[in-house]
Amino acid sequence: MAQKENTYPWPYGRQTAQSGLNILPQRVLRKEAVTPSALVLMSRSNTQPTAAPGQKVVENSSGTPNFSTRSFTIDDFEIGRPLGKGKFGNVYLAREKKSHFIVALKVLFKSQIEKEGVEHQLRREIEIQAHLQHPNILRLYNYFYDRRRIYLILEYAPRGELYKELQKCRTFDEQRTATIMEELADALIYCHGKKVIHRDIKPENLLLGLQGELKIADFGWSVHAPSLRRKTMCGTLDYLPPEMIEGRTHNEKVDLWCIGVLCYELLVGNPPFESASHNETYRRIGKVDLKFPPSVPAGAQDLISKLLKHNPSDRLPLAQVSAHPWVRAHSRRVLPPSAPQSVP
Protein backbone atom coordinates (compact mmCIF):
# COMPACT_ATOMS: atom_id res chain seq x y z
CA MET A 1 0.00 0.00 0.00
CA ALA A 2 1.28 3.44 -0.85
CA GLN A 3 2.55 5.62 1.95
CA LYS A 4 0.18 8.30 3.09
CA GLU A 5 1.24 11.69 1.77
CA ASN A 6 0.89 15.11 3.36
CA THR A 7 0.92 14.02 7.01
CA TYR A 8 4.39 15.42 7.75
CA PRO A 9 5.41 19.07 8.07
CA TRP A 10 7.57 20.67 5.40
CA PRO A 11 11.01 19.31 6.31
CA TYR A 12 13.11 22.37 5.47
CA GLY A 13 12.91 25.44 7.67
CA ARG A 14 9.61 27.10 8.49
CA GLN A 15 6.53 25.04 7.86
CA THR A 16 4.83 25.21 4.49
CA ALA A 17 1.42 23.99 3.43
CA GLN A 18 1.58 20.23 3.03
CA SER A 19 -0.22 20.28 -0.29
CA GLY A 20 -1.78 23.05 -2.29
CA LEU A 21 -0.44 26.35 -3.51
CA ASN A 22 -3.12 28.73 -2.35
CA ILE A 23 -0.87 29.16 0.71
CA LEU A 24 1.98 30.49 0.26
CA PRO A 25 20.69 24.87 -8.85
CA GLN A 26 21.61 23.08 -9.41
CA ARG A 27 20.09 21.87 -12.65
CA VAL A 28 17.84 19.07 -11.58
CA LEU A 29 16.40 17.25 -14.55
CA ARG A 30 16.09 17.29 -18.29
CA LYS A 31 13.08 16.47 -20.42
CA GLU A 32 13.14 14.36 -23.56
CA ALA A 33 11.80 15.42 -26.91
CA VAL A 34 8.20 14.66 -27.73
CA THR A 35 7.30 11.22 -29.08
CA PRO A 36 4.31 10.38 -31.30
CA SER A 37 2.70 8.37 -28.50
CA ALA A 38 2.98 11.31 -26.13
CA LEU A 39 1.38 13.62 -28.69
CA VAL A 40 -1.53 11.21 -29.14
CA LEU A 41 -1.92 10.94 -25.38
CA MET A 42 -2.00 14.72 -25.07
CA SER A 43 -4.50 15.16 -27.89
CA ARG A 44 -6.83 12.64 -26.27
CA SER A 45 -6.44 13.93 -22.75
CA ASN A 46 -5.52 17.59 -22.38
CA THR A 47 -7.88 18.86 -25.03
CA GLN A 48 -10.91 17.14 -23.54
CA PRO A 49 -10.57 16.62 -19.78
CA THR A 50 -13.08 14.12 -18.47
CA ALA A 51 -14.18 13.41 -14.94
CA ALA A 52 -14.45 10.21 -13.01
CA PRO A 53 -18.04 9.08 -12.38
CA GLY A 54 -19.76 11.59 -10.12
CA GLN A 55 -16.77 13.92 -10.10
CA LYS A 56 -16.95 17.36 -11.68
CA VAL A 57 -13.75 18.66 -13.24
CA VAL A 58 -13.16 22.30 -12.36
CA GLU A 59 -11.22 24.18 -15.04
CA ASN A 60 -9.85 27.68 -15.20
CA SER A 61 -10.15 30.04 -18.16
CA SER A 62 -7.19 28.41 -19.93
CA GLY A 63 -8.84 24.98 -19.90
CA THR A 64 -6.44 23.64 -17.27
CA PRO A 65 -8.01 21.74 -14.35
CA ASN A 66 -7.75 23.76 -11.15
CA PHE A 67 -5.10 21.74 -9.34
CA SER A 68 -4.08 24.51 -6.93
CA THR A 69 -7.04 24.00 -4.59
CA ARG A 70 -6.71 20.22 -4.28
CA SER A 71 -4.65 17.91 -2.12
CA PHE A 72 -2.87 15.09 -3.93
CA THR A 73 -1.18 11.76 -3.30
CA ILE A 74 0.78 9.64 -5.74
CA ASP A 75 -2.29 7.43 -6.12
CA ASP A 76 -4.02 10.28 -7.96
CA PHE A 77 -1.73 9.78 -10.98
CA GLU A 78 -1.09 7.21 -13.67
CA ILE A 79 2.67 7.24 -14.16
CA GLY A 80 4.09 6.95 -17.67
CA ARG A 81 7.55 6.95 -19.20
CA PRO A 82 10.47 8.84 -17.66
CA LEU A 83 11.12 12.25 -19.22
CA GLY A 84 14.39 12.95 -17.47
CA LYS A 85 16.78 11.81 -14.76
CA GLY A 86 18.92 13.81 -12.38
CA LYS A 87 20.90 13.62 -9.16
CA PHE A 88 17.85 14.52 -7.03
CA GLY A 89 15.26 12.31 -8.73
CA ASN A 90 13.32 11.83 -11.94
CA VAL A 91 10.62 13.42 -14.07
CA TYR A 92 7.80 11.28 -15.43
CA LEU A 93 5.01 11.77 -17.90
CA ALA A 94 1.86 11.36 -15.81
CA ARG A 95 -1.91 11.64 -16.10
CA GLU A 96 -4.13 12.87 -13.28
CA LYS A 97 -6.84 10.23 -12.94
CA LYS A 98 -9.92 12.39 -12.36
CA SER A 99 -9.35 14.94 -15.11
CA HIS A 100 -7.15 12.81 -17.42
CA PHE A 101 -4.91 15.88 -17.67
CA ILE A 102 -1.32 15.23 -18.75
CA VAL A 103 1.46 16.64 -16.57
CA ALA A 104 5.16 16.20 -15.90
CA LEU A 105 5.63 14.82 -12.39
CA LYS A 106 9.00 15.71 -10.89
CA VAL A 107 9.86 13.24 -8.12
CA LEU A 108 12.65 14.42 -5.81
CA PHE A 109 14.29 12.42 -3.02
CA LYS A 110 14.57 14.26 0.28
CA SER A 111 17.77 12.40 1.18
CA GLN A 112 19.57 13.71 -1.91
CA ILE A 113 18.27 17.24 -1.44
CA GLU A 114 19.48 17.26 2.17
CA LYS A 115 22.82 15.71 1.22
CA GLU A 116 23.53 18.48 -1.29
CA GLY A 117 22.16 21.21 0.98
CA VAL A 118 19.79 22.63 -1.65
CA GLU A 119 16.61 22.73 0.43
CA HIS A 120 16.46 26.51 0.05
CA GLN A 121 16.69 26.26 -3.74
CA LEU A 122 13.82 23.80 -3.90
CA ARG A 123 11.69 25.91 -1.63
CA ARG A 124 12.49 28.99 -3.71
CA GLU A 125 11.60 27.16 -6.93
CA ILE A 126 8.24 26.12 -5.51
CA GLU A 127 7.33 29.46 -3.97
CA ILE A 128 8.27 31.48 -7.04
CA GLN A 129 7.18 29.26 -9.91
CA ALA A 130 3.82 28.45 -8.35
CA HIS A 131 2.77 32.08 -8.51
CA LEU A 132 3.84 32.81 -12.08
CA GLN A 133 1.28 32.42 -14.86
CA HIS A 134 2.48 33.38 -18.33
CA PRO A 135 2.31 31.51 -21.67
CA ASN A 136 6.11 31.37 -21.87
CA ILE A 137 6.73 30.22 -18.28
CA LEU A 138 6.36 26.56 -17.32
CA ARG A 139 3.50 26.19 -14.86
CA LEU A 140 3.91 24.59 -11.46
CA TYR A 141 0.37 23.47 -10.68
CA ASN A 142 0.89 22.05 -7.19
CA TYR A 143 3.14 19.89 -5.04
CA PHE A 144 2.84 17.21 -2.36
CA TYR A 145 5.18 14.97 -0.40
CA ASP A 146 5.54 11.82 1.66
CA ARG A 147 8.24 10.52 4.04
CA ARG A 148 10.88 10.10 1.33
CA ARG A 149 9.91 12.19 -1.67
CA ILE A 150 8.67 15.58 -2.81
CA TYR A 151 6.48 15.68 -5.93
CA LEU A 152 6.11 18.72 -8.18
CA ILE A 153 3.14 18.72 -10.58
CA LEU A 154 4.44 20.60 -13.62
CA GLU A 155 3.16 21.60 -17.01
CA TYR A 156 4.25 19.08 -19.66
CA ALA A 157 6.41 20.58 -22.42
CA PRO A 158 6.11 17.99 -25.23
CA ARG A 159 9.01 19.15 -27.38
CA GLY A 160 11.56 18.98 -24.59
CA GLU A 161 14.67 21.02 -23.95
CA LEU A 162 15.84 23.86 -26.13
CA TYR A 163 19.35 22.64 -25.31
CA LYS A 164 18.79 19.30 -27.03
CA GLU A 165 17.16 20.97 -30.00
CA LEU A 166 20.17 23.27 -30.34
CA GLN A 167 22.54 20.31 -30.10
CA LYS A 168 20.64 18.61 -32.90
CA CYS A 169 20.48 21.68 -35.17
CA ARG A 170 23.87 23.14 -34.14
CA THR A 171 22.56 26.68 -34.79
CA PHE A 172 19.15 28.31 -35.25
CA ASP A 173 18.13 30.61 -38.09
CA GLU A 174 17.11 34.24 -37.68
CA GLN A 175 13.39 33.52 -37.50
CA ARG A 176 13.64 30.98 -34.72
CA THR A 177 16.16 33.00 -32.72
CA ALA A 178 14.21 36.24 -33.01
CA THR A 179 11.01 34.46 -31.98
CA ILE A 180 12.73 33.10 -28.87
CA MET A 181 14.04 36.57 -28.04
CA GLU A 182 10.54 38.06 -28.24
CA GLU A 183 9.09 35.28 -26.09
CA LEU A 184 11.86 35.64 -23.51
CA ALA A 185 11.54 39.40 -23.37
CA ASP A 186 7.80 39.22 -22.78
CA ALA A 187 8.12 36.53 -20.09
CA LEU A 188 10.90 38.42 -18.29
CA ILE A 189 8.94 41.68 -18.39
CA TYR A 190 6.25 39.73 -16.53
CA CYS A 191 8.76 38.26 -14.04
CA HIS A 192 10.48 41.56 -13.34
CA GLY A 193 7.11 43.22 -12.86
CA LYS A 194 6.59 40.74 -10.02
CA LYS A 195 10.10 41.43 -8.67
CA VAL A 196 11.34 38.00 -9.79
CA ILE A 197 14.86 37.69 -11.25
CA HIS A 198 15.53 34.35 -12.97
CA ARG A 199 19.37 34.64 -12.99
CA ASP A 200 19.95 31.39 -14.90
CA ILE A 201 18.53 31.79 -18.40
CA LYS A 202 20.30 29.26 -20.65
CA PRO A 203 19.28 26.55 -23.16
CA GLU A 204 19.09 23.81 -20.51
CA ASN A 205 16.46 25.78 -18.57
CA LEU A 206 14.22 26.52 -21.55
CA LEU A 207 11.63 24.02 -22.75
CA LEU A 208 9.41 23.86 -25.83
CA GLY A 209 5.63 23.51 -25.79
CA LEU A 210 3.41 21.64 -28.21
CA GLN A 211 3.53 24.39 -30.86
CA GLY A 212 7.22 25.05 -30.28
CA GLU A 213 6.55 27.99 -27.96
CA LEU A 214 9.21 28.75 -25.37
CA LYS A 215 8.71 27.81 -21.70
CA ILE A 216 11.08 29.19 -19.07
CA ALA A 217 11.70 26.49 -16.45
CA ASP A 218 13.97 25.73 -13.50
CA PHE A 219 13.53 28.59 -11.06
CA GLY A 220 15.96 27.06 -8.56
CA TRP A 221 18.39 29.96 -8.97
CA SER A 222 15.73 32.64 -9.27
CA VAL A 223 14.83 34.97 -6.45
CA HIS A 224 11.88 37.07 -5.41
CA ALA A 225 13.70 40.19 -4.28
CA PRO A 226 11.53 43.19 -3.41
CA SER A 227 14.64 45.36 -3.54
CA LEU A 228 15.73 43.72 -6.81
CA ARG A 229 19.31 43.82 -5.54
CA ARG A 230 21.38 40.73 -4.69
CA LYS A 231 25.03 39.88 -4.11
CA THR A 232 25.20 36.07 -4.25
CA MET A 233 27.02 34.11 -6.96
CA CYS A 234 24.77 31.81 -8.98
CA GLY A 235 24.03 30.75 -12.51
CA THR A 236 26.23 29.15 -15.16
CA LEU A 237 29.76 30.40 -15.87
CA ASP A 238 29.33 31.12 -19.60
CA TYR A 239 26.20 33.15 -18.84
CA LEU A 240 27.40 35.07 -15.77
CA PRO A 241 27.48 38.87 -16.21
CA PRO A 242 30.47 41.00 -15.15
CA GLU A 243 28.82 42.29 -11.98
CA MET A 244 28.36 38.74 -10.68
CA ILE A 245 31.84 37.43 -11.43
CA GLU A 246 33.26 40.61 -9.88
CA GLY A 247 31.17 40.09 -6.73
CA ARG A 248 29.24 43.32 -7.12
CA THR A 249 25.61 43.84 -6.18
CA HIS A 250 23.31 42.87 -9.03
CA ASN A 251 19.69 43.36 -9.96
CA GLU A 252 17.19 42.24 -12.60
CA LYS A 253 19.51 43.45 -15.37
CA VAL A 254 21.48 40.20 -15.05
CA ASP A 255 18.68 38.63 -17.10
CA LEU A 256 19.34 41.13 -19.91
CA TRP A 257 22.93 39.94 -20.09
CA CYS A 258 21.80 36.30 -20.12
CA ILE A 259 19.44 36.71 -23.06
CA GLY A 260 22.21 38.48 -24.97
CA VAL A 261 24.49 35.48 -24.39
CA LEU A 262 21.65 33.15 -25.37
CA CYS A 263 20.95 35.03 -28.61
CA TYR A 264 24.62 34.69 -29.56
CA GLU A 265 24.71 30.97 -28.72
CA LEU A 266 21.57 30.22 -30.72
CA LEU A 267 23.00 31.87 -33.84
CA VAL A 268 26.65 30.77 -33.48
CA GLY A 269 26.42 27.43 -31.65
CA ASN A 270 28.48 28.34 -28.59
CA PRO A 271 28.44 31.13 -25.96
CA PRO A 272 30.36 34.32 -26.84
CA PHE A 273 32.93 34.12 -24.03
CA GLU A 274 33.54 30.36 -24.05
CA SER A 275 37.23 29.61 -23.49
CA ALA A 276 39.58 26.73 -22.71
CA SER A 277 39.81 27.68 -19.02
CA HIS A 278 37.56 29.25 -16.41
CA ASN A 279 40.07 32.03 -15.82
CA GLU A 280 40.06 32.97 -19.49
CA THR A 281 36.26 32.92 -19.56
CA TYR A 282 36.21 35.21 -16.52
CA ARG A 283 38.68 37.55 -18.20
CA ARG A 284 36.70 37.74 -21.43
CA ILE A 285 33.43 38.39 -19.60
CA GLY A 286 35.02 41.14 -17.50
CA LYS A 287 36.37 42.86 -20.61
CA VAL A 288 33.23 42.07 -22.65
CA ASP A 289 35.56 40.57 -25.26
CA LEU A 290 32.79 40.11 -27.82
CA LYS A 291 33.63 38.87 -31.32
CA PHE A 292 31.14 37.96 -34.03
CA PRO A 293 31.71 35.46 -36.84
CA PRO A 294 30.66 36.70 -40.29
CA SER A 295 27.57 34.45 -40.19
CA VAL A 296 25.83 36.61 -37.56
CA PRO A 297 23.49 39.13 -39.27
CA ALA A 298 24.11 42.82 -38.64
CA GLY A 299 20.73 43.26 -36.94
CA ALA A 300 21.43 40.45 -34.50
CA GLN A 301 24.90 41.84 -33.81
CA ASP A 302 23.32 45.17 -32.96
CA LEU A 303 20.85 43.58 -30.53
CA ILE A 304 23.46 41.38 -28.83
CA SER A 305 25.92 44.26 -28.51
CA LYS A 306 23.27 46.40 -26.83
CA LEU A 307 22.52 43.64 -24.30
CA LEU A 308 26.11 42.66 -23.50
CA LYS A 309 27.16 45.91 -21.83
CA HIS A 310 29.52 45.91 -18.85
CA ASN A 311 27.45 48.56 -17.07
CA PRO A 312 24.04 46.98 -16.29
CA SER A 313 22.24 50.31 -16.65
CA ASP A 314 23.45 50.54 -20.27
CA ARG A 315 21.79 47.28 -21.32
CA LEU A 316 18.83 47.44 -23.68
CA PRO A 317 15.53 47.31 -21.72
CA LEU A 318 13.31 44.29 -22.32
CA ALA A 319 10.54 46.27 -23.99
CA GLN A 320 13.11 47.54 -26.49
CA VAL A 321 14.30 43.99 -27.10
CA SER A 322 10.79 43.08 -28.26
CA ALA A 323 10.64 46.24 -30.38
CA HIS A 324 14.14 45.88 -31.85
CA PRO A 325 14.01 46.08 -35.68
CA TRP A 326 15.74 42.72 -36.13
CA VAL A 327 13.31 40.99 -33.75
CA ARG A 328 10.30 42.68 -35.35
CA ALA A 329 11.46 41.68 -38.84
CA HIS A 330 12.05 38.01 -38.08
CA SER A 331 9.96 36.91 -35.08
CA ARG A 332 7.02 34.60 -35.74
CA ARG A 333 5.68 34.23 -32.23
CA VAL A 334 2.96 31.59 -31.77
CA LEU A 335 1.29 33.01 -28.67
CA PRO A 336 0.25 36.64 -28.23
CA PRO A 337 2.05 38.85 -25.70
CA SER A 338 0.61 38.73 -22.20
CA ALA A 339 0.02 42.47 -22.28
CA PRO A 340 0.56 45.41 -24.63
CA GLN A 341 4.14 46.63 -24.55
CA SER A 342 5.39 50.15 -24.99
CA VAL A 343 8.92 51.28 -25.65
CA PRO A 344 10.11 53.70 -22.96
Curated annotation (Swiss-Prot):
- PTM Phosphothreonine: list the residues: 35, 64, 232
Please state what the protein is called. Aurora kinase B
> How does it associate, per the subunit comment?
Component of the chromosomal passenger complex (CPC) composed of at least BIRC5/survivin, CDCA8/borealin, INCENP, AURKB or AURKC; predominantly independent AURKB- and AURKC-containing complexes exist. Associates with RACGAP1 during M phase. Interacts with SPDYC; this interaction may be required for proper localization of active, Thr-232-phosphorylated AURKB form during prometaphase and metaphase. Interacts with p53/TP53. Interacts (via the middle kinase domain) with NOC2L (via the N- and C-terminus domains). Interacts with CDCA1. Interacts with EVI5. Interacts with JTB. Interacts with NDC80.
- Cellular compartments per GO CC: centrosome; chromosome passenger complex; cytoplasm; kinetochore; midbody; nucleus; spindle microtubule; spindle midzone
Entry's EC annotation: 2.7.11.1
In terms of domain of life, where is this protein from? Eukaryota
Entry-linked PANTHER family: SERINE/THREONINE-PROTEIN KINASE IAL-RELATED
Q: Describe how its activity is regulated.
A: Activity is greatly increased when AURKB is within the CPC complex. In particular, AURKB-phosphorylated INCENP acts as an activator of AURKB. Positive feedback between HASPIN and AURKB contributes to CPC localization.
* Family affiliation: Belongs to the protein kinase superfamily. Ser/Thr protein kinase family. Aurora subfamily.
Species the sequence originates in: Sus scrofa
| Residues bearing PTM Phosphoserine | 62, 227
Q: Does the keyword ATP-binding apply?
A: yes
Its taxonomic placement starts with:
Eukaryota, Metazoa, Chordata, Craniata, Vertebrata
Could you tell me the gene encoding this protein?
A: AURKB
Any Pfam family the entry gives = Pkinase
List, for all copies, the residue spans of the domain called Protein kinase: 77-327
Question: What is the recorded function of this protein according to its Swiss-Prot or TrEMBL entry?
Answer: Serine/threonine-protein kinase component of the chromosomal passenger complex (CPC), a complex that acts as a key regulator of mitosis. The CPC complex has essential functions at the centromere in ensuring correct chromosome alignment and segregation and is required for chromatin-induced microtubule stabilization and spindle assembly. Involved in the bipolar attachment of spindle microtubules to kinetochores and is a key regulator for the onset of cytokinesis during mitosis. Required for central/midzone spindle assembly and cleavage furrow formation.
Q: Where is the active site?
A: 200
